Structures are given as structure tokens and as C-alpha cells.
């Protein structure tokens, strides 16, 4: 932020012409005598921290001069790296509010203005200041600072409907819920040590950091891309089955679009911003923007509601703090299944939330998480709970375990209810997976309307649901769960339908590679991902490597198996080998992968043809 400060005998200004669409209305001129004029340019990266320090420095300067009149004058010509107008206006307004005890006024923002000034002649009459970020960086946006200072109360709601203050609840028997409560109380999101999944994602050839990109942007190797695509397909199939219309929307939006300004002002420092042909754009952090704008293109009747739009965003972007970025747990670019339901009123929204709650429970379970693997949190206003407490308690009853509740006296966000399933890792860090929100603001903000039973026009209540959470975070959760299993002495594994290789065929000798190949192709015809370890390595080494890659079924093909057509199948779970027919193996795999999408191998058929990933 840059400020040119002038102590003036007289200041007179008048708005002449609008410069931008977001210019303030109404715009009036003014005349002041014996006042300090502060020309202010807000720059990219500025936040409330800079606004607060600028206000403090102006206060000190006026104190030294002995003047109590101040005119804040937006003045773009002091910098070539200006912030988006929506951000600049917000920060200048914050400066004005911080100096409310002075005789402070502000020239209208976004206008070409004529002005006349007469500057006094004393040593302190003129000054220039550059306000930069403090040691913590560029400061958080107002909404985030307000969020961090918000007062809420914490409770635990049990399946029998009892609400207890969290400080008085007996967490014995609920260690993960206790960890979630501690995590929320501490507000510490960083980590001191890399969680176990980081080593696993590299060793398993799933994903790794990309130094050539921004932090929090990952690269996925063939194994990781296969796992990720299968999860994406499954979640999408379930949402479409539920009634979602799958759509696709842009990844970037105009920061100054009328529908975006108030929304974007909530979290400006968390966005990637880019300039294009004079436009200030930001990269979406969810599918909300595109889906809300698209909903406005529809002619909706109450008969069409709930109206459900769905998009799998590849990608959503959020500039999380660098100290919070770790592995697949928290990223700056991520894949998010995002389904919005537009409802007639709160009653319909509450009913729809119940349907989506069950959808999310089932999806997260089918992805490989048991109910005991995650903890539930609910955030809501006192008013919403007073009016809809029965529905909230029913949700907790169906969850079947105590739930952490954060209750606000007043609504700060656009939603009145938000619930989420949180995975608690070995370090006690919580990561939200499935979630839903009841939004009472954005229907009006985006001009979304439907015709009610009386032919009146109404704004819908909107639900924001991700039945799984970010796809990358699902993979993180599965790897962390596998690491925890390993620490307990259980063999780590992925769900069979997500295993990059479900069966590995190991021929005893080179002369049996052809038999192994025919068997693998036959298995592929039944939807089983099978490969052939044709390398000139010992049988023991090849079996050990298959175990290290978490291959569930290991088939050894010798002369006996080639002649009889029977299979010697080693189940990695038990470590035991069993003789069976191909039909038996196919049936076993089908039972474990029923209802899930299938795909072929995403790497060469023969292990001898595969290059090694050096991680």
C-alpha cells in the first residue's frame, strides 16, 4: 500500500466520471479546510494487516501535526501493481472505520475526480509511506480475521439427543472425538513431521511434489492416476444416480463481476489471482460460482425443485498457507466433487440435507472407510438449532456416535448449518471429507429465482454437498489408514477395486511366460487387473515385491498349473496359498468390487517393460 500524505489549508474535490463498473454510488464531492489529505493506492497482496498499519501511521502523523481532519482519497496513480477494485475498496473502508474517532471522510472510489488543494509549508506537511506485510506475511482478509475472532460455544451432542458442554463431556471411549475437539481448539493446522502417507504415496508410485510448480500442486504417476480416476468415476456415478445434473463450468472468474464482489471479498487472500487484458480474475476455490451463474440461466418452477447441479472440479484452487501444505492432506490445487441442490424453502432444504447425509455416509463407506474411521462435526447457529433441532438430532442418531457441535449466537457465514466427516490421523490432525451446508445468502446474491405456487418469484435455499470431499484427500485418508493398520500389525492395503494391480502372475520359468500371458488376458476379460512378472529374478524376490506393492492375489504358474488349468493363488491378506479354478477367483474379485467402476492396467503388461520411478 502506498500513501502520499499532504497537510492542506484547503481541499476541494468533485466526482466527474465513472472509471469502473464497481464505482461507489452515490458519489458526492466535498470541501475541507485545515485537513490532511491521504492519497492511497492499494496494491496486490495487501490485506487488513496493511490497512490497520496504514491507519495507525496516519493517526500518528496527524497527532504529530496536531490535526484531526483527514480525507482518504483513493489514488491509483501511485502504483503499477494495483489490487482488484473490490479488495481495494474494502481495505480503504477498513482504514476509514479504524479512524472513526477522527474527523475522517473519504472521496468516492472508482471515479475520475477534479480536485484543488493548497498545501501548507512546514516540514511535516508532505510525506510518503509504503506499507508492506509484517512478519506473518501480507495479512489475512477481513473475513478470515473476523472468522478467527468469532465467538462460538462448543458442545457434544449424543445419539440420545443430549447436548453437553464440550468442557464437561466425558471423552472416555471417544479418543478420536477428543482429538477433533483439541484440534479445533488449538487452531494449529501445520504439522511438525511428514505424516506416514507421504512416504507411502512415493513408494507406491502414486504421487509426489512437483518442484517446478507452486507448492501444493501435485503430480500423479500412473498408479495414482488410476486410483484417482476410479474414485472420481464412482463418486460421479453416485451423484448422478441421486439426481445430479453433471455440468462443467470455467475455472476462473472476473473479480469485479457484480455477482462476485461480495462473495470474493470474504476470502481474497486465499485465491490465485491473474490479469488478462485488463481484467482481474481469480481461480475458483469451488464449483459454486459457475453453478450459481448457470442456475440463473434456468427458468425454474417450484415443481423443478430440488434442482441439483453437479461438477467434479479439476481443479479447484485455494492458496493455503505454505506451512499447512503437506502431502495429499492439504493442497492448493485439488479435485472436488461439488453438488448444489436448490430448494424452495428451509423445510425442503432440511429434508434434502437428510437425503444427502445418507448418500455421503454410503459413499464414504464404499470408498473404504468404516464409520469408526471418522468423526462428525456440526456447525450451526442458535436460531437454526432452535427451529430445526429435531432434524439435527436425527442426523446424530443415524450417525450412531457422539458428535462435536460448534454453535454461533449469530450467523457470520452464508450458511446456517454445516456438517462434515473428519478423518483424524496419527498426529491428531483432522481433515474434512464429506460435507454439506445450508446456504441462505447466495440465492439472492446471484439472482437465482424460481416461481412459487402463487406465481411469485422467490430465491432458493441452496445446499453445498461434497459426498466424499476432495479426491486427493480420500487417497490421503486411505493411505493413512493403511499406515495405521501396518503399525498395529495388520497388512496395509487399498480396497481391491482401487488396487492398481489386483492379481500378479509369476511364471516359474521363461518357458511359462506364454501360459501366464494367456491367463492374464483371460482375467482381464473378466475385469481383473492382472500383470505378469516376467523378469529373470528369483521366485522369492518376485513374491516379496508383489507383497510390497500390495497386490492382493499372487498366482504362481508352474508346469503343474499349466497342465491342470488349476491355479495356485496366494492371498496377501492371509499369506496362504490355495488351489482354485479361474472361475472361483473371478467370483471372489467380483464380490469385493461389486458396484464399483472398473478399468484396465495403467502401466505395461509385463514388469520387464516398466521403467522404475525414482522417488
From Swiss-Prot:
Subcellular location field: Cytoplasm
UniProt xrefs under CDD domains: ThrRS_anticodon (cd00860)
Record text on cofactor binding: Binds 1 zinc ion per subunit.
Chief subcellular location: cytoplasm
Region (Catalytic): 196-495
InterPro entries, alphabetized: aa-tRNA-synt_IIb, aa-tRNA-synth_II, aa-tRNA-synth_II/BPL/LPL, Anticodon-bd, Anticodon-bd_dom_sf, DTD-like_sf, Thr-tRNA-ligase_IIa, Threonyl-tRNA_syn_edit_dom_arc
Gene3D superfamilies found in the cross-reference section: Anticodon-binding domain (3.40.50.800), Bira Bifunctional Protein, Domain 2 (3.30.930.10), D-tyrosyl-tRNA(Tyr) deacylase (3.50.80.10)
Binding site for Zn(2+): 288, 340, 464
BP term (GO), one: threonyl-tRNA aminoacylation
Pfam families to which the protein is assigned, alphabetical: HGTP_anticodon, tRNA-synt_2b, tRNA-Thr_ED
This protein's UniProt keywords: Aminoacyl-tRNA synthetase, ATP-binding, Cytoplasm, Ligase, Metal-binding, Nucleotide-binding, Protein biosynthesis, RNA-binding, tRNA-binding, Zinc
GO MF annotations, alphabetized: ATP binding; threonine-tRNA ligase activity; tRNA binding; zinc ion binding
Subunit: Homodimer.
Entry function: Catalyzes the attachment of threonine to tRNA(Thr) in a two-step reaction: L-threonine is first activated by ATP to form Thr-AMP and then transferred to the acceptor end of tRNA(Thr). Also edits incorrectly charged L-seryl-tRNA(Thr).
Name by which UniProt lists this protein: Threonine--tRNA ligase
Source organism of this protein record: Cenarchaeum symbiosum (strain A)
Amino acid at each position: 500500500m502506498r500513501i502520499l500524505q499532504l497537510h492542506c489549508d484547503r481541499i476541494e474535490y468533485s466526482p466527474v466520471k465513472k472509471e469502473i463498473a464497481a464505482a461507489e454510488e452515490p458519489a458526492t464531492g466535498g470541501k475541507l479546510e485545515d485537513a490532511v489529505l491521504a492519497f492511497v493506492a492499494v496494491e496486490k497482496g495487501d490485506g487488513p494487516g496493511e490497512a490497520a498499519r496504514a491507519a495507525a501511521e496516519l493517526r500518528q502523523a496527524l497527532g504529530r501535526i496536531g490535526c484531526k481532519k483527514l480525507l482518504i482519497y483513493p489514488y491509483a496513480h501511485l502504483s503499477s501493481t494495483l489490487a482488484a477494485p473490490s479488495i481495494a475498496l474494502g481495505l480503504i473502508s477498513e482504514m476509514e472505520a479504524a479512524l472513526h474517532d477522527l474527523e475522517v471522510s473519504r472521496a468516492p472510489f472508482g471515479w475520475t475526480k477534479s480536485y484543488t488543494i493548497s498545501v501548507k509549508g512546514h516540514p511535516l506537511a508532505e510525506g510518503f509511506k509504503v506499507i508492506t506485510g509484517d512478519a506473518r506475511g501480507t495479512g489475512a482478509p477481513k473475513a478470515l480475521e473476523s472468522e478467527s475472532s468469532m465467538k462460538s460455544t462448543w458442545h457434544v451432542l449424543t445419539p440420545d439427543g443430549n447436548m453437553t458442554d464440550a468442557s464437561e463431556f466425558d471423552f472416555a471411549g471417544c479418543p478420536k472425538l477428543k482429538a477433533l475437539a483439541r484440534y479445533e481448539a488449538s487452531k494449529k493446522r501445520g504439522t511438525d513431521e511428514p505424516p506416514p502417507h507421504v512416504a507411502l504415496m512415493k513408494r507406491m508410485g502414486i504421487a509426489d511434489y512437483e518442484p517446478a510448480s507452486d507448492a501444493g500442486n501435485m503430480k500423479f504417476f500412473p498408479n495414482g492416476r488410476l486410483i484417482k480416476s476410479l474414485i472420481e468415476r464412482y463418486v460421479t456415478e453416485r451423484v448422478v444416480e441421486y439426481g445430479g445434473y453433471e455440468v462443467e463450468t470455467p475455472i476462473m472468474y472476473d473479480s469485479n463481476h457484480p455477482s462476485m464482489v461480495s462473495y470474493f471479498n470474504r476470502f481474497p487472500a486465499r485465491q490465485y489471482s491473474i490479469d488478462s487484458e485488463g481484467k482481474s480474475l481469480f481461480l475458483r476455490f469451488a464449483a459454486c460460482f459457475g453453478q450459481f451463474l448457470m442456475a440463473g440461466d434456468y427458468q425454474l418452477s417450484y415443481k423443478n425443485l430440488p434442482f441439483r447441479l453437479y461438477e467434479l472440479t479439476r481443479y479447484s484452487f485455494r492458496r493455503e498457507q505454505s506451512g499447512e501444505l503437506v502431502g495429499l492432506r492439504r493442497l492448493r490445487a485439488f479435485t472436488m466433487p461439488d453438488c448444489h441442490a436448490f430448494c424452495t424453502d428451509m423445510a425442503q432444504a432440511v429434508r434434502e440435507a437428510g437425503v444427502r447425509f445418507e448418500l455421503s455416509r454410503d459413499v464414504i463407506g464404499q470408498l473404504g472407510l468404516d464409520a469408526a474411521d471418522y468423526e462428525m462435526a456440526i456447525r450451526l447457529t442458535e436460531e437454526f438449532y432452535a427451529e430445526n433441532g429435531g432434524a439435527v438430532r436425527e442426523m446424530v442418531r443415524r450417525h450412531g456416535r457422539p458428535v462435536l457441535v460448534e454453535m454461533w449466537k449469530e450467523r457470520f457465514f452464508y450458511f446456517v448449518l454445516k456438517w462434515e466427516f473428519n478423518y483424524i490421523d496419527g498426529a491428531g490432525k483432522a481433515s474434512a471429507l464429506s460435507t454439506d451446508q445450508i446456504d441462505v445468502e447466495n440465492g439472492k446474491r446471484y439472482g437465482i429465482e424460481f416461481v412459487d405456487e402463487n406465481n411469485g418469484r422467490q430465491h432458493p435455499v441452496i445446499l453445498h454437498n461434497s459426498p466424499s470431499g476432495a479426491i486427493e484427500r480420500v487417497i490421503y485418508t486411505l493411505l493413512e489408514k493403511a499406515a495405521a493398520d501396518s503399525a498395529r500389525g495388520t497388512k496395509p492395503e487399498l480396497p481391491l477395486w482401487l488396487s492398481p494391480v489386483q492379481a500378479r502372475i509369476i511364471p516359474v520359468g521363461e518357458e511359462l511366460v506364454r501360459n501366464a500371458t494367456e491367463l492374464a488376458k483371460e482375467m482381464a476379460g473378466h475385469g481383473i487387473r492382472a500383470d505378469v512378472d516376467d523378469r529373470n529374478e528369483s521366485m522369492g524376490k518376485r513374491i516379496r515385491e508383489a507383497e510390497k506393492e500390495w497386490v492382493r492375489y499372487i498366482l504362481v504358474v508352474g508346469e503343474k498349473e499349466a497342465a491342470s488349468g488349476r491355479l495356485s493363488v496366494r492371498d496377501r491378506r492371509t499369506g496362504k496359498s490355495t488351489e482354485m479354478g479361474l472361475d472361483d477367483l473371478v467370483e471372489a474379485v467380483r464380490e469385493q468390487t461389486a458396484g464399483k467402476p472398473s478399468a484396465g492396467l495403467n502401466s505395461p503388461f509385463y514388469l520387464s517393460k516398466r521403467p522404475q520411478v525414482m522417488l
